[in-house]
Swiss-Prot record:
Listed GO biological process terms: inner mitochondrial membrane organization
Family listed: Belongs to the AIM24 family.
Subcellular location: Mitochondrion
Lineage: Eukaryota, Fungi, Dikarya, Ascomycota, Saccharomycotina
Name of the featured protein: Altered inheritance of mitochondria protein 24, mitochondrial
Keywords from the UniProt entry: Mitochondrion, Transit peptide
Organism: Saccharomyces cerevisiae (strain YJM789)
Amino acid sequence: MISPRVNTRVWQRSISLLSPQAAKTESNVVTKERTYIENLSKDIATSRFRLVDENGKIASITVQPDIPICIKKDCLVSIHNLNHLSLSYKWLNFWSNLIKFRSFKSSLFHRIIGSSVLEILAAPNFQISRRPFDSSRSLSVLNLTGTKDWNVFGKDSIIAFEQNSSLEIKSPIFPSARSLVSNSSKSQLPRKFQILNGRGNVLVCGGGLVYSIELIDECDKILVNSRNILAINGQSQLDIANSVERQELHVEGAYVGDSSNDTVAPKFIKNQTLKSAYGHTVQFFKRMRSWIRNQYEKRYIYGVDSYFMKIKGPRTILIQTHEMTTSKDNILTKLTSKSHVKKSTVNDNGVNLEKQVANDVNSKIIELANRPSLFIATVSQDGRVDFQSTSKFT
């Protein structure tokens, strides 16, 4: 069960979203900074990571001299103060990430070193599924002092980190033996995560908005959708494994009812063997119907794409909203895909209709993408495509 205290915090957060000026009550849900600070020691000269805007779209990184900083490919925006600047690349957990995420791009980082203080801007400009940067992604900063471990989920979650002798980023392929024997199989975390431990700064990225929720004690629990968890911390990997319990939403089986009368064979069946076979056959089809209905409700009504994790404190978790976006690229891809273009034919003028249709559609892409309203496309026999706004038909 989720404690009333967590419900109160989440409800207060929902009020602050609607009316930010009216909600003055302090909450454990971090909104602006979205930065988990662990009282970094003053005698440690490290880099400084901070978010430039409240939406977390871009981050500023102040790098001390001769301290390497690693930034994910395509995420570097700008560098200020270019005195004796050195740029190279670094593969982070190449083989483990390749096996786990089936992608080598998640391991490629640009390594930057300067002889003076550098001011760097970084943003999540990497491509996802062959599509350009998704503006719904936002950043969050983790400041580690070595007292706790962080598990960060997702192949593209780590955007930047400072490379020092203390900070360690691991990507285990198989769960550790200690986590396996800690509890039952229900306590296992999703396997696709990376472990952060030691001291240093790490810039992570999540879908939609990113919020930090603090669970105060062991009685403080929360139920989180597995797709929405970005990171979780703990005293050790064993502590994190023991704090998470996997819970799936079970669908109640369909009520079959009293089938004692239904399995009775008709009077014209005299043979006892046939009567028994008839009863077993009827019962089999009833159970099969119940199973099909159960699977249908589980897959199409309740959904099986995700499961829930019950997490108990004390610890801090990062939640990503995973805002659902209806990208215009999906519509444009369907319009220009080969399946929507007929085979090449030649008209009376010898013009290739397929190329003409493709060129006509491409000429309207910019206009179509910049207008939020709906359009009606009219395709004439000669291959011309005419787009008209629905406002003209009202």
